[in-house]
Every structure is written in structure tokens, then in C-alpha cells.
Amino acid sequence: MMQLSNDSHCNKHSLLNVMNRFIAAANNMDETIMVPNLLRDVPLEDQESHASVSHNNNNNNEPSFPNKQRDMYEHYLLLKSIKNDMEWGLLKREMAGGASFLEMAVKQEELPQMKGEAVEEGPDLEGQFHYHLHGLFSVLSKLTVQADHLTNRYKREIGGGSLLR
């Protein structure tokens, strides 16, 4: 049986630590935002200007993708949904009848075979693992920043009363 060292819990660059930071930020967001409906119709413009600055400072030259959410409420729901998927896994989504990420991945794997294209005989599993691990670190770090930003903006806007109608 493989034993984990205690250092893995302390390593700030571990996947578990990055996941825990996002979940903590999402929990803080959820505890702070007592009335999520106040976020309806509040534009993401403040966050988009913040995101464009962070994308310009990005050392990885990663492409920036526009947000699909129309307002802060939809962004809040997205972050909360991702947190729930991480905590409860994909089984809950599958039981609800929605297409799971696993099903989508299997369908993507089957596409080249259906088109008659040759699928690589010996996939580089280690390379794929590191590629996706890097992606997880990147996405979870960005989601953590977004959850913190949404929480702080909610506090600022509610404190000023600008979201109250």
C-alpha cells in the first residue's frame, strides 16, 4: 500500500491545495452572498476589466475566452455548480439526467474512430496527465480569483447599496 507523506498536505503547489483553495473561496462566496437574486442584471463589466488586465499579464500566453455568463448571477451559479461537481463528483449529475463530463469525454474519444481516422496506438499517458494537470491548476487558480472577486464586488456593491432597488 502506498503511503502519502505529510508534506503533500503542506505543499502549496499540490493539486489538493489548489482544489481546497477554490472550494474555500466558493464557500466564502456562498456564505457572503445571502441574496443571490440581487446579482441578477448586474453586468460583469467590472470583472471583465479585471480579467483583461490579468490576461495581459499572463506569462503562459494562454488565449482569453469571453465569458458566457450575461450577469453576475449567472457567474455565481457557474462557480457554485463547479464547486458542487468537485465535491459530489459526476454521479450526481448523471443521476439527474444531464450529460456528464465523463460521457462527453468518451464521445470525444469515439469521434476519430467513427470518422475512420487512425487513433494513436500507444498514447502518451504521462504526457496527457501532465497536460491536463497543468490545465487543472490553471483553471482552478482562475476560478479561485473569480470567486474572490465576485465576493468582494458583492460586499462593495451591497455596502454602497447600489444593487438594492
Swiss-Prot record:
Recorded family membership: Belongs to the SPOT14 family.
One of the Pfam families matching this protein, by short name: Spot_14
Domain of life where this protein originates: Eukaryota
Name recorded for this polypeptide: Mid1-interacting protein 1-like
Keyword Metal-binding: no
Gene3D superfamilies recorded: 6.10.140.1610
Biological process annotations from GO: regulation of cytoskeleton organization; regulation of lipid biosynthetic process; regulation of ribonucleoprotein complex localization
